[in-house]
Regions:
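ATP/NTP-dependent adenylation/nucleotidyl-transfer catalytic domains that generate, transfer
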Residues: 3-26, 41-45, 49-52, 59-60, ...
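Conserved G/P- and acidic residue-centered "switch" motifs that form tight phosphate/ATP-binding loops
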Residues: 33
């Protein structure tokens, strides 16, 4: 793959879409991970003065916030920090008492989505989503959370290719080398939670063989079980 050309084409595609719909700028969450960093760098190339990154800690890992700040500084990105921790905690105390770890954790990206759309509507900006093709295949995301966006620039780019795109965009090495994580809880990583590496997943998505039968079956199962996330809600036809 010619990563330089892909990066140039990607930036142009995003810019063309923004022009087509009359967007005044872009807004997105800046999580401290590589996907949001790539989104931020693309946004800055299209709208150098009208790109806003929201850092939205929500009972989050401090290191992620620090990394998000470093990325913003590296690309000279305008940012706004909105701490959603107290909002999350109040919801937990008042309404959501279940000990289901995933159900509780998924509230966080949904709060962030709500915050992003408040500012997007106020500013006339489009919300950029950070989902990549590897996550999209499994829909390793929160429905109506981080998957809620107006445009998904990297949704057709596999995770292993995202690292190369990041290099083309001039992002700092620390973010390229950081272990992918949704930051849902301390110590959580994508690959630990999935049970296989992105290299294995991407090879399978490309049509290559997966060495272990159990992993292939798990990927197939996750793809099937998450199919409802990749389509609009079904409607009864009269």
């Amino acid at each position: 793959m010619d990563y330089k050309k892909v990066t140039e084409d990607l930036v142009k595609w995003v810019g063309d879409y923004a022009k087509k719909v009359g967007a005044k700028g872009f807004i997105f969450g800046l999580s401290g991970g590589i996907d949001s960093a790539v989104i931020a760098a693309i946004a800055k190339r299209v709208f150098p003065d009208n790109s806003l990154g929201l850092i939205m800690p929500c009972d989050s890992i401090e290191k992620d916030r620090e990394d998000a700040l470093k990325v913003a500084k590296a690309i000279n990105l305008e940012i706004k920090t909105i701490d959603l921790t107290s909002t999350f905690e109040e919801l937990m105390k008042a309404s959501f008492t279940s000990e289901n770890k995933m159900a509780r954790s998924n509230i966080k990206p949904r709060l962030r989505m709500t915050t992003l759309y408040y500012y997007a509507q106020d500013l006339g900006y489009l919300v950029l989503g950070p989902s990549n093709a590897s996550e999209w295949y499994l829909d390793y995301s929160t429905k109506y959370g981080d998957s809620g966006a107006d445009i998904m620039p990297i949704a057709n780019i596999l995770k292993t290719d995202i690292f190369e795109i990041a290099k083309e965009l001039g992002l700092p090495e620390f973010i390229i080398n950081k272990k992918p994580s949704a930051g849902l809880w301390v110590g959580q990583t994508d690959e630990d939670e999935m049970g296989f590496t992105y290299e294995v997943l991407d090879s399978y998505v490309r049509g290559e063989k997966v060495p272990e039968k159990e992993i292939k079956e798990k990927i197939d199962r996750m793809h099937k079980n998450s199919s409802h996330k990749r389509v609009m809600a079904p409607k009864f036809e009269i």
